Curated annotation (Swiss-Prot):
Transferase recorded as keyword: no
UniProt keyword terms in alphabetical order: Cytoplasm, Jasmonic acid signaling pathway, Nucleus, Plant defense, Transcription, Transcription regulation, Ubl conjugation
UniProt gene name: TIFY10C
Annotated source species: Oryza sativa subsp. japonica (Rice)
Pfam families (UniProt xref): Jas_motif, tify
Protein name as it appears in the record: Protein TIFY 10c
Length: 232
């Protein structure tokens, strides 16, 4: 029993001696760190020293609040967030595509140029020529459908019949000499008839033979009167 008591006493003495050595080392370490970091703050335990007491208003002049410290390097300890490429592509695809007004106008003008090409349209109707500038090709089909419902239009080909249209003015030019010739003949016939019917010398000629015929026959009547008187 006595041996056990002595063993426990020696173990307790060793523990006390080791604790004392640890405390002495800690106090020495704090003394060394007091000049650089100061106390427990240099150990990295996150402890800050107590703020200093504000000086009296009359001793150093105006009252100044204690300086505040800001930890600007706190974001370096946070782990970096990595973005997967698949999620970035899907997010870009989900965004709505907005076109500028200039792009929309260029697309519309290109579609109009491809679908509706304006050309010159010439129509011959009623001896007149009508010309339309920049007439869209899509409206030509509508115009042919409207014209095809008429009577003087061939429904199979969609073109107007040439028989119903009057002759153009330039086709009557070769007929002008013939018309002049006919009018000249009519004028000569009228003048010839007038000369034969109303000429004064023809009237005198016709009157002279009638007088001569009457004079030749007068003696015949005188002879008859003489024979009648002799018989009486």
């Amino acid at each position: 029993m006595a041996g056990r008591a002595t063993a426990t006493a020696t173990a307790a003495g060793k523990d006390r001696s080791s604790f004392a050595v640890t405390c002495s080392l800690l106090s020495q370490f704090l003394k060394e760190k007091k000049g650089g970091g100061g106390g427990l703050q240099g150990l990295g335990l996150g402890l800050r020293p107590a703020p200093a007491a504000p000086p009296a208003a009359g001793a150093g002049g105006a009252f100044r609040p204690p300086p505040t410290t800001m930890n600007l390097l706190s974001g370096l300890d946070a782990p970096a967030v990595e973005v997967e490429p698949n999620t970035a592509e899907t997010a870009a695809d989900e965004l709505p595509l907005i076109k500028a007004p200039a792009d929309q106008q260029s697309d519309e003008s290109a579609s109009e140029a491809a679908g509706e090409k304006a050309q010159q349209l010439t129509i011959f109707y009623g001896g007149k020529v009508v010309v339309f500038e920049n007439f869209p090709s899509t409206k030509v089909k509508d115009l042919l459908q409207i014209v095809s419902t008429g009577d003087g239009v061939d429904k199979n080909t969609g073109t107007a019949a040439t028989q119903s249209l009057p002759r153009p003015a330039h086709n009557s030019l070769p007929d002008l000499p013939i018309a002049r010739r006919n009018s000249l003949h009519r004028f000569l016939e009228k003048r010839k008839g007038r000369m034969n019917a109303n000429a004064p010398y023809q009237a005198n000629c016709t009157a002279a033979p009638s007088k001569q015929a009457n004079g030749d026959k007068s003696w015949l009547g005188f002879g008859q009167e003489m024979t009648i008187k002799q018989e009486i």
